[in-house]
């Protein structure tokens, strides 16, 4: 995997996984249905996101990484929430849905994708929060993940 992984392709996969996770949280639709919607929607509505964040709109996307993130978060959301809970200052049900999706995505990467450095996971979550979440959400996401990282990664 190592050197052949393109950061832009992973970034795109994270963006679309975040949107798909958010969609799943809202609709509770079958994950396969949501995945199919993203895979058949013409480059994941690339045009819509080009104006918001050009770096995220590159045509390449690591589709297998997208699938892993989406399925992994949906299948393990209860476990991910349990790992997040000690580091979140309010009840999980009170979190903004986009913040929850971001935290679940990042926690999945930190706990299940040890090939991705935890600093990369945190930075990518912050950047996604700046684009998709409320104005100061990136600060909240950063704080939670900074506190969680040493507890979920052996040498964080």
Curated annotation (Swiss-Prot):
InterPro entries: NusB-like_sf, NusB_fam, NusB_RsmB_TIM44. The keyword Signal does not apply. GO terms for molecular function: RNA binding. It comes from the Bacteria. The keyword Cytoplasm does not apply. GO terms for biological process: DNA-templated transcription termination; transcription antitermination. This is Transcription antitermination protein NusB. The gene is nusB.
